[in-house]
Amino acid sequence: VDHLLDARHNGKTRFRFSINSRYVINHFEPGTSSFDGRLAAARKVAGAGYKLGFVVAPIYRHEGWERGYFELFQELARQLEGMDLSDLTFELIQHRFTKPAKRVIEQRYPKTRLDLDETKRKYKWGRYGIGKYVYRDEEAKELEDTMRRYIEQFFPGAYVQYFT
């Protein structure tokens, strides 16, 4: 992001960063920037006066997920302390998968810890004629309520654009 820090954005440009719990980044996002690297970039752009947004995705239920996401928002708040967060946004996207994606993941990562058990999910028709597996309604509601509660606790002025 360094080459964008001195651009004349006139306060009209928003940087959106994908963030997740350390567990999800470490186990399911190989080859991506670390949690700390993402936060360092977010601090830089916020310091340059850009609006900030965070896409929490995919929100994944795993053992200890509540603690992991609490720590995510706690550390995010600590790292962004003193920054102008007056127009901070969050987008919340639960883990989902399609049958074709499941096949690819299982072929490329045969030892994955990613739970792709279709019997534990709800089938939802997608916009483009292909269905996807999402968490069941009660699990999705628990995810959404938990994320919104953490955001309200650590970023009371932030706007959650959506949960899907």
Which residues does each PLM region occupy?
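Conserved AdoMet/S-adenosylmethionine-binding subsite of the radical SAM
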Residues: 1-118
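C-terminal accessory extensions appended to soluble enzyme cores
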Residues: 83, 91-164
